[in-house]
Amino acid sequence: MKTRIGPDGVHLFDRFSGLNVLLDEWRPEEAVWSMSPRQVSIALTNVCDLHCEYCYAPKHKASLHTDQLLGWLKELDTEGCLGIGFGGGEPTLHPDFADICQRAAGETQLAVTFTTHGHRLTPQLVERLKGSIHFARISVDGVGRTYEEQRGKPFASLLRGME
């Protein structure tokens, strides 16, 4: 369990049980507040294998270095951050995605989440992520034909990935 002290009170958080409580009856002095954000969103890569017309991701390809990223995660954990959310681009396209999630879950007390387009979710990847991911978000921009027009991929393939 993690305890984070901030201007709103004392935040108790446990990524395993789901406990997430803010005790706001006590207002601690500023000198003891955690200086970290509660949650941090990290774009692991800006690489994506979809070509959505509305996407703001840059067209050059770049990914964060795994060891440097894990150093940041450990620092955030030590400073009181409660969780990290990986995004991108498409985070599953980072060459070390599963390893990063496993190490983040094993080497920190951070809740690990990610947002994906869902097309790369295979049984093998899901199996590798078990025990490391606290929840995943799948972006869905419509259904059927609307989805296919927006994303350029078959909606049925998204549904297969979500099974």
Where are these regions (language model features)?
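Long, mid-chain structured domain cores
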Residues: 57, 65-66
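A generic structural micro-environment signature
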Residues: 7, 11, 27-29, 50, ...
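Radical SAM/AdoMet-radical enzyme domain recognition
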Residues: 66-86, 94-163
